[in-house]
């Protein structure tokens, strides 16, 4: 099995952290839809929200 690159490791742990958070919230009875944005997609979304709310 090939070793993961640092970028792959980082992405893997981001995904695991997100899934673990979702499962932890579900145990508390709170349902939150899973967010699957890449870092670039998140930055674009933040820019859109800033433009909308900083009028």
From Swiss-Prot:
It comes from the Bacteria. Pfam families: YhfG. This is Uncharacterized protein YhfG. It comes from Salmonella typhimurium (strain LT2 / SGSC1412 / ATCC 700720).
């Amino acid at each position: 099995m090939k070793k993961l690159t640092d970028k792959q490791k980082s992405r893997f742990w981001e995904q695991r952290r997100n899934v673990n958070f979702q499962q932890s919230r579900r145990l508390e009875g709170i349902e939150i839809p899973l967010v699957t944005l890449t870092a670039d997609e998140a930055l674009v979304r933040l820019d859109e929200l800033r433009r909308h709310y900083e009028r």
